[in-house]
């Protein structure tokens, strides 16, 4: 196995020795941005909880992305992906880095990004073990791995690592149709993304640096001799159902995301808030377009839309009926309040629309005013209409 040339003109390199356990624990003690997870068996995992350009500029910080140590002697057992960025972000390689490759005619390698849950496989005392970015015993990723990987694939993975003396980490992405992130997959699967040298930090790509492993799925890395980041970003911008692509030289990585992925990511961060904003501004058609390919989310949007339509219809019907009855306002308000209680957190929206209809005013606008409030987002969240991204943090 041999590595590619390291990325040029970048201010930081993932090559070289990993941060020591002492340095990792020091960072965890001095900032709340890092956490230490222990498994009770002598292993410690250090990872970031959130990050900023300033934080990731600290020495060793980009390596603390789920790195696993043996606490007794500080040995690094597993070295996962370092933190890397989208093209255009402050710490990502810029145009000058790509130009250096074009000028020297050294290839870069491009692969479609697998959109699942990142996992790492490593050997400890000859035993194959798995971890996620946040846990040595990941409940979600562990369950998905057991579901997607058969014994033959597990054995092949163990042999692949053992053949290299156990000083490599296998970097994996786990996907499952029952736990989608953004891109929907038809069946469970585990994809081998790369191997990483624990001691030296460089990466080996399947099909580029070592033969494609039998019984294992893998990403396909395609060489590009004349890679232009701006042209490439334009090529993929309008792709639907694809999160994006990753470009590497075997040391540094850069992400290129599609417009669809950025829009969907915004929705997944706050589905209730984004839905209510689109509903109140009559932009549901745009939202539906942004969710193309995610039938589960489209069904959730339809359910939420039907729920609000039913709520509004009942409120206006009640207000109109009270007006026709000729009830005084105080009595009408009392009846509206009694009925509104059935709608839980949406009671204010019901009451305001009903009273606007009772008074012959703009019931729709009154209804939308309430939907723009934070309390409406909480009320919609309580209905559990929108599926959540899997129960573990990602990053």
Curated annotation (Swiss-Prot):
Influence of temperature on activity: Optimum temperature is between 65 and 70 degrees Celsius.
Keywords of the record: ATP-binding, Ligase, Magnesium, Metal-binding, Nucleotide-binding
Site feature (Essential for RNA ligase activity) residues: 173
EC number: 6.5.1.3
Keyword presence, Signal: no
Residues the record marks as active site: 113 (n6-amp-lysine intermediate)
Molecular-function annotations in GO: ATP binding; ligase activity; metal ion binding
Binding site for Mg(2+): 285
Enzyme class of the recorded protein, top EC level: ligase
UniProt-listed InterPro entries: T4-Rnl1-like_N
Reaction(s) catalysed by this chain's protein: ATP + (ribonucleotide)n-3'-hydroxyl + 5'-phospho-(ribonucleotide)m = (ribonucleotide)n+m + AMP + diphosphate
Cofactor(s) demanded: Mg(2+); Mn(2+)
pH dependence text: Optimum pH is between 7.5 and 8.0.
Top-level lineage group: Viruses
Binding site residues for ATP: 48, 65, 83, 173, 255, 257
Biotechnology: The thermostable RNA ligase could be of potential use in various applications including nucleotide labeling, oligonucleotide synthesis, gene synthesis, gene amplification and amplification of mRNA and synthesis of cDNA. These methods of use have been described in Patent WO2004027056.
Cofactor binding, note field: Optimum activity is reached at 5-10 mM for both Mg(2+) and Mn(2+), with Mn(2+) showing slightly higher activity than Mg(2+).
Known role: RNA ligase that ligates single-stranded nucleic acids in an ATP-dependent manner. Catalyzes both inter- and intra-molecular single-stranded DNA (ssDNA) ligation to >50% completion in a matter of hours at an elevated temperature, although favoring intra-molecular ligation on RNA and single-stranded DNA substrates. Is able to catalyze the adenylation reaction of ssDNA 3'-terminal phosphate (ssDNA 3'p) to 3'-adenylated DNA (ssDNA 3'pp5'A). Does not have significant 3'-adenylation activity with a 3'-phosphorylated nicked dsDNA substrate.
Name of the protein this chain belongs to: RNA ligase 1
Organism of derivation: Bacteriophage TS2126
Gene name of the encoded protein: RlnA
